[in-house]
């Protein structure tokens, strides 16, 4: 199931870098007064076009699924979905904090209630794999699993959950509006469907999308340079697709062993020895805002995470200057939080 790095593609990209100027802007010797980007906007756009589509809100979906989305929003904030009514989806995936919550994760870690960092809930609809170990292939199965997991909502007794919701008067009209053709609308299946409807519209269009749509000024000269370096260092080999990741599984520490071997990732799902240290490649959307980084939260700073993954995954030494340049590009993947959509009930 997991895909390894495509070495042939990487070599082809390297050859292209060495023998093509990619539309580099020419600069006169000694001219240091004006910042000239190392690559033209159109040249960088052409690099990303083969695998990236512009991310934008689907107004038709928002209108068509309005009642289901509204129900999902209410459920997302409701702590009564958890066994002891202590935690909601939003407590871990804080929508006001780009869909994650480092403080909450730290608290759970101290209590030994979790061993993995909390990934962002935003832009999940465009992923092919879910969970750090890629153990789910649909958002629906991931959402249902989160409710039952002892490390998340801990509500494995779905009968108890449905009985609880049916006893809450406010939910009866919400479920009836969202599922008007269902004679028994308050069911586990409809609950999950409503949550997924809400989660699927949690997207954050960013400057990179305006850039890919043709706005040359959406990215700064520094971000253009960082984008070129992102490609030159083969980051896009794994962090590919519109979400810049979330499409494949990969061995963490493919070239140099990952320092923390306590969590073996996908191996726990398959029990296949070759799957030890296999993890899902993370989406880089909003990565600037979602520290700490990696499943083990081993990097607090984005530039450090860039250097670390390059060293262990590709065997490449990336200087601090280069890492900061890539970090500047990654800021262009930070989108706007849909404030109206995520208002608390």
Q: In which residue ranges do the predicted regions lie?
A:
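Post-cleavage N-terminal segment of exported redox proteins
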Residues: 2-69, 127, 150, 154-224, ...
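C-terminal substrate/ligand-recognition segments
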Residues: 280, 290, 320-323, 330-334
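Short glycine/threonine-rich turn/loop motifs
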Residues: 28-145, 208-307, 314-317, 341-345
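Residue-level detector of well-ordered alpha-helical segments, enriched
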Residues: 88, 117, 187-194, 234, ...
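Compositionally biased, low-complexity linear motifs
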Residues: 149-151, 311-313
């Amino acid at each position: 199931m997991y895909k390894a790095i495509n070495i042939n593609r990487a070599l082809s990209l390297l050859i292209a870098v060495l023998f093509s100027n990619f539309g580099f802007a020419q600069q006169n010797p000694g001219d240091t007064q004006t910042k000239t980007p190392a690559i033209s906007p159109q040249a960088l756009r052409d690099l990303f076009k083969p695998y990236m589509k512009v991310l934008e809100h689907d107004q038709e979906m928002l209108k068509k699924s309005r009642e289901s989305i509204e129900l999902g929003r209410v459920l997302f904030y409701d702590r009564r979905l958890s066994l002891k009514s202590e935690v909601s989806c939003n407590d871990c995936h804080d929508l006001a904090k780009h869909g994650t919550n480092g403080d909450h994760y730290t608290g759970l870690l101290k209590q030994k209630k979790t061993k993995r960092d909390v990934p962002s809930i935003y832009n999940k609809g465009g992923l092919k794999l879910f969970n750090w170990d890629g153990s789910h292939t649909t958002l629906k199965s991931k959402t249902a699993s989160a409710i039952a997991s002892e490390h998340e909502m801990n509500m494995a007794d779905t009968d108890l959950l449905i009985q609880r919701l049916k006893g809450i008067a406010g939910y009866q009209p919400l479920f009836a509006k969202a599922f008007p053709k269902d004679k028994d609308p308050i069911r586990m299946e409809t609950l999950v469907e409503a949550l997924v409807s809400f989660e699927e519209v949690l997207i954050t269009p960013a400057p990179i999308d305006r850039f890919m749509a043709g706005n040359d000024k959406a990215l700064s000269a520094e971000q253009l340079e960082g984008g070129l370096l992102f490609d030159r260092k083969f980051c896009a080999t794994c962090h590919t697709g519109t979400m810049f990741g979330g499409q494949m599984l990969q061995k963490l520490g493919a070239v140099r062993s990952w320092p923390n071997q306590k969590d073996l990732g996908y191996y726990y799902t398959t029990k296949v020895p070759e799957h030890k240290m296999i993890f899902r490649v993370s989406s880089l959307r909003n990565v600037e805002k979602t520290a700490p980084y990696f499943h083990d939260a081993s990097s607090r700073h984005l530039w450090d995470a860039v250097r670390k993954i390059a060293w262990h995954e590709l065997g490449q030494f990336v200087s601090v200057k280069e890492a900061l340049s890539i970090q500047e590009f990654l800021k262009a993947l930070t989108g706007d939080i849909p404030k109206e959509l995520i208002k608390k009930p």
